[in-house]
A protein has these predicted regions:
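Short Gly/Thr-rich strand-loop-strand
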Residues: 598-614
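Inter-lobe coupling/hinge segments of SF2-like helicase ATPases
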Residues: 163-191, 198-230, 236-239, 246, ...
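Short, solvent-exposed loop/turn elements at beta->coil junctions and helix N-caps
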Residues: 17-18, 259, 462-466, 602-607
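A general secondary-structure junction signal
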Residues: 63-65, 114, 376-378, 461, ...
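Accessory, non-ATPase domains that flank or precede helicase/AAA+ motor cores in DNA-metabolism machines
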Residues: 1-340, 347-349, 365-368, 390, ...
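Short proline/glycine-enriched turn/loop segments at secondary-structure junctions
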Residues: 50, 561, 604-607
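Short amphipathic alpha-helix segments
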Residues: 547-549, 578-602
Length: 673
């Protein structure tokens, strides 16, 4: 390596490229020209040349060094596009670990962690930093209440991992502002961390949960110490909040699943609410859940980790069983008043009633005092239709999609292609009569509005979200997850369509329903009844005794015997038959030191479009080896030699055929639905 002018040693920048190509998932060495030497710091955005492609690529400097093994001439950095080190070493190490666990690319994880640059926002932030203005100081000494004598406080201070059972109640954090009691617990834990001079990250499923936590935090800590990172934010607001996270001052960072990648110089706590919510699973490559990222980051940083929920997931219960996570319950215990109609006298006679007399009478009495929540399975008017005579599901004649009715006196239409079924007839019995199998939020609201004339009816679902309702009498019809928080809590809760929810074919259907129902019941006022219709057995007992963790624990032996998650891990491999076969054959048979761990392959099965899908089940001890093997297969497939395509019109070879598809996804439980 030649020395620069002035006898300075050549500075080398190791750069991660922003590229979806798996073969580029490594660090590339570039020489730093003298003009860029002061700006080329680890974490900054750069532009670099790609010799093979003859173009300029974007990337980040991960590290700089003055020693390099390469003996040839290195290409030079083309440009440092920003002097702000947005990719911190901690986040880079996290991205590398996460991508290796899921056989993905580190650049895909960095894309989730670092929002797009906003030049004006960045320049304004830099001017603020130069002004020397300091954020507010937080000098309080808060404690997490409701869990005995500082149990959670000591765990946060010691950096332990907790599975916290949330308190089923609502709480007024400021005059007229009510939130779930769980939000207060997370806010108190974050404030406790902030008071110790460390940063807290709070990861939540969606914007409804974020609003509750921010409201609870606002009553405890200064607003300028709260940063929100959310994909729903305008790009400028999100980038501004991200830059705040780069500052040295500790703060509370609140957001959705990607917030677990937020930069934090002195990280003291990661808190995750409702880890089993599917919104915690990243839909983009490498498809890693908030729970897994939080566990990795806690291991790397040594911070405290707090999982909170009303109903513990089987994934978390497995970690409790292994004593890797410590369970914490409310002290004193809080027991909601849950009434299952399936266990009441005369339940068999009322089994066919969607709303039995017990539920009607409970709602009527409760409406004299305040709002009543009615949870239903589906939005819309009549989301499921069938033949009135033979009960065959009604299907679209164009695409075979399910038919639905969007409103009263509307014509059935396809839920997939939108085709109107004006002259529908049953293909099985030729009947033209349609039966409304289920009632969605709109039809339920219509029926209850007639049953309780003069009562306010509020519909809350994905299309018409309501985050809060006041304490005045009202019927609130909501789908699962869209229930508003009522001032003072609901005076009664009716959980309808329980049998229909449980009829969904899925490995996790029982624990999902338990989670949906538990979250709704937790919105009740003290001693208010929660009526669950048509559900009995172990699920009803878990709700009545408020012992959801026992149900989760009882699931694990069966999952272990059947080799289902979370007792084993899954990976799906999708591609053309020969490509999938090559990837499967390359898997290791065993790993030294873990000879008892096993790998088994299910399939391949047809995945449509000429592709097949194989499912790999493997023990946790084999996870790293399986990920490395599949990652190698992805790279080989991506870099394999391809044949030229010949133009039929001219007979000339015009382009290269792209490599065959090979997609790998770890911990994909959707295939079990």
């Amino acid at each position: 390596m030649t020395a620069q002018a002035g006898h300075e040693q050549q500075l080398i920048a190791r750069v991660m490229l922003e590229s979806p190509l798996p073969q580029l998932d490594r660090l590339f060495d570039y020489a730093v020209p003298a003009a860029l030497r002061e700006q080329a710091r680890p974490g900054v955005r750069v532009k670099v040349p790609l010799r093979s492609a003859g173009r300029i690529a974007r990337g980040y400097i991960v590290e700089t060094t003055e020693a390099v093994e390469f003996s040839g001439t290195l290409s030079e950095l083309d440009e440092v596009t920003s002097s702000v080190p947005v990719l911190t070493p901690e986040v880079w190490n996290l991205a590398r670990r996460v991508s290796e666990r899921a056989a993905g690319s580190a650049s895909d994880v960095v894309r989730l962690a670092v929002p797009p640059r906003q030049v004006r926002v960045e320049k304004a932030w830099q001017l603020e930093q130069q002004s020397g203005e300091q954020p507010s100081r937080y000098s309080a000494n808060p404690s997490v209440t409701g869990y005995g004598d500082r149990v959670i406080d000591s765990a946060i201070d010691a950096g332990r991992r907790l599975a916290v059972a949330a308190i089923p109640a609502v709480h007024e954090v400021s005059p007229g502002v009510w939130v779930g009691r769980w939000a207060v617990t997370l806010a108190e834990a974050a404030a406790r961390t902030l008071a110790s001079g460390r940063t807290a990250i709070v990861a939540l499923p969606d914007y409804r949960d974020q609003q509750q936590v921010v409201q609870a935090l606002s009553a405890l800590v200064p607003l300028d110490l709260i940063s929100q990172l959310d994909a729903r934010q305008p790009n400028a607001d999100r980038y501004r909040a991200f830059l705040r996270c780069l500052e040295d001052a500790p703060r509370v960072i609140v957001g959705n699943r990607s917030v677990v990648y937020a930069p934090a110089g002195r990280l003291g706590l990661i808190a995750v609410w409702d880890d089993a919510d599917p919104l915690h699973t990243e839909p983009l490559s490498p498809y890693v859940s908030t729970r897994d990222v939080a566990l990795i980051r806690q291991e790397q940083s040594g911070c405290a980790l707090l999982f909170a929920s009303h109903s513990r997931s089987t994934w978390l219960e497995r970690l409790v069983e292994l004593a890797y996570v410590t369970p914490v319950a409310p002290d004193p215990a809080v027991l909601p008043h849950v009434v299952p109609t399936a266990d009441q006298p005369g339940a068999e006679a009322a089994a066919h009633a969607r709303i039995p007399s017990t539920a009607w009478n409970t709602a009527r009495r409760a409406l004299e005092d305040g709002p009543v929540l009615v949870q239903v399975a589906r939005p819309g008017y009549a989301p499921v239709l069938a033949c009135q005579d033979c009960r065959t599901p009604a299907r679209c004649r164009v695409c075979e999609g399910a038919l639905r009715i969007g409103g009263a006196r509307q014509t059935p239409a396809c839920d997939l292609c939108g085709a109107i079924a004006a002259d529908w007839h049953c293909r099985h019995c030729e009947s033209t009569r349609i039966r409304l199998v289920t009632a969605g939020t709109a039809r339920t609201a219509e029926e209850l509005g007639r049953a309780f004339p003069g009562t306010r009816v509020i519909v809350s679902d994905g299309e018409r979200p309501h985050l809060t309702v006041d304490a005045k009498p009202a019927l609130v019809i909501a789908t699962r997850g869209a229930e508003p928080v009522a001032a003072g809590g609901y005076r009664a809760i009716l959980l309808l369509d329980g049998e229909r929810m449980l009829a969904r074919e899925s490995l996790t259907v029982a624990e999902d329903c338990l989670r949906w129902w538990s979250n709704a019941i937790a919105l009740a006022a003290p001693r208010a009844p929660a009526i669950i219709v048509g559900v009995g057995g172990a699920l009803a007992r878990a709700l009545v005794t408020w012992s959801q963790q026992r149900f989760s624990a009882a699931e694990l032996p069966d999952r272990r015997a059947l080799r289902f998650p979370p007792m084993v891990r899954l990976a799906t491999v999708t591609g053309r038959a020969e490509t999938v076969e090559q990837a499967i054959c390359a898997l290791p048979d065993s790993v030294d030191g873990h000879e008892s761990a096993t790998i088994d392959v299910l399939g391949p099965v047809d995945a449509g479009d000429g592709l097949v899908r194989a499912t790999i089940r493997f023990d946790y001890a084999l996870g790293a080896e399986v990920a490395r093997s599949l990652r190698s297969s992805i790279i080989r497939n991506s870099t394999g030699r391809t044949k030229r395509q010949t133009s039929k019109a001219t007979g000339t070879k015009t382009s290269f055929r792209p490599p065959p598809v090979l997609r790998v996804r770890f911990d994909d439980t959707e295939i079990l639905e």
